[in-house]
Amino acid sequence: KEGYPVGRDGCKISCVINNNFCKVECQAKWRQSDGYCYFWGLSCYCTNLPEDAQVWDSSTNKCGG
C-alpha cells in the first residue's frame, strides 16, 4: 500500500523537494516504509505501507475543519 501520510490536523504533510524529511515522517509512523516528497502535490508520499495504514483519502478528507 502507499499514500499520503496525515498530520495531526488531518491534512497531508507538506514538503518542498525534501525527500529525507518525508522518509523520516513515513518511517516514524510505519517503520518499514519509505517516503519521498511528491513534487506536484508538495506533500510527503509514503510507500511500502501495511494494508491497515491510515493515509489521506479525498472522500474522508478532514483537513482544515
Swiss-Prot record:
InterPro entries: LCN-type_CS_alpha_beta_dom, Scorpion_toxin-like, Scorpion_toxin-like_sf, Scorpion_toxinL, Scorpion_toxinL/defensin. Residues 1-64 form the LCN-type CS-alpha/beta domain. Disulfide bonds join 11-63, 15-37, 22-44, 26-46. Pfam families: Toxin_3 (PF00537). It comes from the Eukaryota. Keywords: Disulfide bond, Ion channel impairing toxin, Neurotoxin, Secreted, Toxin, Voltage-gated sodium channel impairing toxin. Expressed by the venom gland. It is found in: Secreted. GO terms for molecular function: sodium channel inhibitor activity; toxin activity. Belongs to the long (4 C-C) scorpion toxin superfamily. Sodium channel inhibitor family. Beta subfamily. Beta toxins bind voltage-independently at site-4 of sodium channels (Nav) and shift the voltage of activation toward more negative potentials thereby affecting sodium channel activation and promoting spontaneous and repetitive firing. This is Putative beta-neurotoxin RjAa12. It comes from Rhopalurus junceus.
